[in-house]
UniProtKB/Swiss-Prot annotation:
Any GO molecular function: indole-3-glycerol-phosphate synthase activity
GO biological process, one term: L-tryptophan biosynthetic process
Family note: Belongs to the TrpC family.
Any Pfam family: IGPS
Gene source species: Pseudomonas putida (strain GB-1)
EC number, as in UniProt: 4.1.1.48
Superkingdom of this protein's organism: Bacteria
Pathway: Amino-acid biosynthesis; L-tryptophan biosynthesis; L-tryptophan from chorismate: step 4/5
Catalytic activity: 1-(2-carboxyphenylamino)-1-deoxy-D-ribulose 5-phosphate + H(+) = (1S,2R)-1-C-(indol-3-yl)glycerol 3-phosphate + CO2 + H2O
Protein name: Indole-3-glycerol phosphate synthase
Regions crossing the membrane: none
Protein encoded by which gene: trpC
Top EC group: lyase
Amino acid sequence: MSVPTVLERIIARKFQEVAERSARVSLAELEALAKAADAPRGFANALIEQAKRKQPAVIAEIKKASPSKGVIREHFVPAEIAVSYEKGGATCLSVLTDVDYFQGADVYLQQARAAVSLPVIRKDFMVDPYQIVEARALGADCVLLIVSALDDVKMAELAATAKDVGLDVLVEVHDGDELERALKTLDTPLVGVNNRNLHTFEVSLETTLDLLPRIPRDRLAITESGILNRADVELMAINEVYSFLVGEAFMRAEQPGLELQRLFFPEQVKKTVQPLD
């Protein structure tokens, strides 16, 4: 019998988690909370408008740890990081809420969103409509659907639930087959290409460049994972990719928002950093 991949272990845990959570808070209770939540801030629209101007549309991620790297950031205050990102020029935020593998928490999303005016995506592994309604109840503006974790019927069901509760959807793909499935099944404008293989956790920016010609112009290509330096950003810009999801490069920096500026808006760093006398 083959050993389950990291993604397979995470997904198995998610089904258990949904059962545990729905036993504590019913779907009807969650739906009431979702209706009472603050209005969505327009995650997709914010990215699309920024990218139209050929300016970096950065989804800045708030992530304490990962299965492949362990703890990434020791000093972890989500509200503080969110404010730093907003000052640094982020267009949107991504907050990890997975507890077991990423040391995330629902409250991190709430704390981050309350501290800023930016739209926020709940970064988690969605396998059930319950989690989608839960995301809206937490105040999220968008949810992530990972094609490699879902069949087409489930993907469509989750996207329909997201639409019902007013959430945008970012669909994430890693190869051509997944891209084809995503484009066929969903009408979301946000197509994320994860340069990290979620089964092996290996990273290659070539993944985005290979899939880019197959992403229609009426969709927004978002490159995810592996953007670590200015050369990576410039490589994407040459290929007309202006939307990014970046986490680790920022999380390892003492000042995440300043690192965001260095990577994406270096001319602003020159203006804000005064030379020593």
